[in-house]
């Protein structure tokens, strides 16, 4: 029996969602042999872009490292603002096992990537989730506490807040990078039938796990295009299906950011019908792997 091909997904998030030229240059930097571009999107209000690539472990690791370097070159956090919390120009870089590879191996990839990022670009890294160096860093929100502005001071003054690789301080303009390994998650944004962001924040507090809400759910309330939005990460869609989250929130519309595993997609469900502009061949991971995007020229 021939060995199963190893496929790793990486979904880096960058703190730039308003300058398409910068984002395209970052995407171009990820064009590495053995790596396929599956998706990328920009959000003006969050001032954030999300890129999804998949391929061989070594190729994906190299693509991620190059992307962080290009982001550090192009993005200056000292003048950057947006709705989304962030600590770095390349804010989070998660490695996700897709086929023929274990989560623990992805954690090793993450640690290798963090070391290489520091070696090449002097951008420090914090390891989170399965790659975390200690229990209190498993949660991304704990790593990102204080955001760039607060962490750049805390990392120097408080030894417990220093990066896992590099430092002790952050990169002056590019901050730090949270590099980790995790399983699939569903990035799901729900728009409420109101312009009151306070309502979205209340709903987010009620549904997120840290507030005693739903298992494996992270949420925050923001204002996007004049509409209140509950921005969610469903980190365990088997324990808490997307439909259950939808059932707790009165939605005007919704969107999926990045790709969604086929196992999480229920096309006949009410929540699925609320998704704006959903094309299965473009948004379901297994289908997109068959027909990846062309790299930007």
Protein language model regions, located:
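Long, contiguous binding/interaction regions
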Residues: 2-297
